[in-house]
Amino acid sequence: MPRLVNGREAAPTYSNLVGFIFIFNLIVGTGALTLPGVFARAGWMLSLIVIVLLAIISYMTVTFIIEAMACANAIRNWQTLQALRQSRSSAENSENDDNADDVSLASGAEQVGDFERVPLTIQNREFHYYQLSHKFELGEMATLFFNEFGRVMFYLCLIVYLYGDLSIYSAAVARSLRDVVCDQTNGTDTNNLMYWPGDFENNTSLACWKEHTISRLNMYRVLLIGFTLIFGPFVYFNVQKTKYLQMLTAAFRWMAFTLMICISLKLLISRGAKGHPATFNVYGIPSLFGACVYSFMCHHSLPSLLAPIRHKSMVSKILSIDYIIICAFYILLAMTGIFAFERIEDLYTLDFLPYDVAYVDFWSGLLICIDYFLALFPIFTLSTSFPIVAITLKNNLQSLFLDMSQYESYSVILRLCFPLLAIIPPFCITYFTESLSSLVAFTGTYAGTGIQYIIPVFLVYFARRTCSELLGSGVVNRFKSPFKSSAWLVFVFIWSILCVCLVSINLFS
C-alpha cells in the first residue's frame, strides 16, 4: 500500500515554447564547458559515438521519470477517490442523526469541491487517473514507491551528486579567477592543461606573478577561501533563484556559448586547424563518460518543470527535440574547439584568455573585452547557482537524518550544523585538488549514473507494479514511456553497471 499523498494546489502554467526553453537551460550548464577538453583527450570519433549513445540513454531514462510521475499522480487521484467514497458512505450512515439534513448539505458541498479538484469519473477514468498536473519531486516519488532502504539509498546518491556539484562550482570559480588574476603567460604552461593531469603539483612551483613569490596553487587556495566565505553563509538563508536572475543568467550563458563557437569557427577559417586530436584514445574514457553524463543531467529537477507545461501531451515531443538540439550543440561546441586550439583547458572558457594581445585600436580592445567576458563567465553563473545548490544539499541532509515533522524540537546547535555539513566537505575537496576533469569524472560516473540511470529504472519499475496492483491493467497510462518493455529496464541497469566498472578500472589502474 503506497503512502498517502497530500493534496496541493496546481502550479501556474506556461506554454510549450517556454517549457522547451526552461528544460534546455536546465540541461545545458557547467558540464558543457568541460566537453571540449574531454573530447580532445578521448579522441573525436570515440567522443562522437559516446555522446550520441549517452544522449539516447539519458532521454530513455527521462521518459521513465515522466511515467513514474504520472503514476504518482494516478495514485494520488486513486487515494482521493477512495477518501471521497468513504466520506459519502459516512454521510449516508449519519442520515438518522438529529442534524441529518445539515450534515448532508455540508458533506455534499465538500464532495463537490473535492470532485472539482479531482476531475475523475468512471466514464473517463483512463484519461484522468494518469496526469502530470501535480509536481512530484524525485524525493517524493522515492518515498512513495521505495521502502526505507531504497529511500535512504536515493538520498545518499543525491547528496553525493550535490557534493560533487558544489565541488565543481568552487573549483571552476577559483580556477577562473586565478587564471585571470595571475600572469597569463603562466596560464598557457603545458603542465596546467588537460593533457597533463599533474597540474596540481606543477602549480605549486609556478609563480602567479614574475615579481612575486606566491604560487599559482596558493593563489587558487586564497581565492577559494574568499569565494567560500562570501557565498557560503547564504546557505543559512532561504535564497531562491528568481525568474529575472534566471533570465539574466540564461542570456549570459547563450551569449558566451555563441561567442565561443563563433570565435572558434573564425579561427578555423582564418588560420586552419591548430588542434590535431586523436581518433580513439581509451584512456580518456573515464573523463569522457563522466562529463557526458554530467552534461545531460536534468532528472533531479525535471518534475518541477513538467508540471506547469500547459499541453502535457506534448511533453515527450518537447524533450525529444531538446535532446536532439542539445546533443548537436554539444558536438558543435566541442568539435570546433578541439580543432581550433592546439591545447584545451579542462574549463573551455580559459582558452579564451587574451594571451599576448595588445590594445592598439577599438577592435583589438573589443576582442580583449570579449575574451575577459568569456573567462569570467563561469564566475557569475556559478556564483549565483552555488547558494541554491548548497541550500538544496542542506535540505536533503536534513530530510535524511532528521524527522522534518519535528524539526523545531531539535536544538539550535544541531540545526546549525547542517549548513556547515553542506559547505565544508566541498571546500576540503577543492582545497586539495583543482582538477575539474577528475571532479566531473567522479561526480558524473558514480553519483550521476545513480541519478540518471539506476534511480529512474527502479522508480518506473515499482511505479508500474504499484499502479497495476491498485488500478489494474485496464487503465492506460498515456504518459507511458515508449521504452515500455522490461527488457529496456534490464538493459539500462546492466549498461550502467558495466560502464561504472569499466570507468573505475581505467580511472584507478
UniProtKB/Swiss-Prot annotation:
Cytoplasmic side stretches: 1-19, 67-151, 240-248, 299-320, 383-411, 461-487
Residues carrying covalently attached carbohydrate according to the record: N186, N202, N203
Chaperone listed as a keyword: no
Localization: Membrane
Family: Belongs to the TMEM104 family.
Leader sequence segment: none
TM region(s), chain numbering: 20-40, 46-66, 152-172, 219-239, 249-269, 278-298, 321-341, 362-382, 412-432, 440-460, 488-508
Entry annotated with the keyword Nucleotidyltransferase: no
InterPro entries membership: AA_transpt_TM
Extracellular topological intervals: 41-45, 173-218, 270-277, 342-361, 433-439, 509
Keywords for this protein: Glycoprotein, Membrane, Transmembrane, Transmembrane helix
Membrane topology per record: Multi-pass membrane protein
Main localization, broad class: membrane
Gene Ontology CC, one term: membrane
Protein known as: Transmembrane protein 104 homolog
Superkingdom to which the source organism belongs: Eukaryota
Upper taxonomic lineage: Eukaryota, Metazoa, Ecdysozoa, Arthropoda, Hexapoda
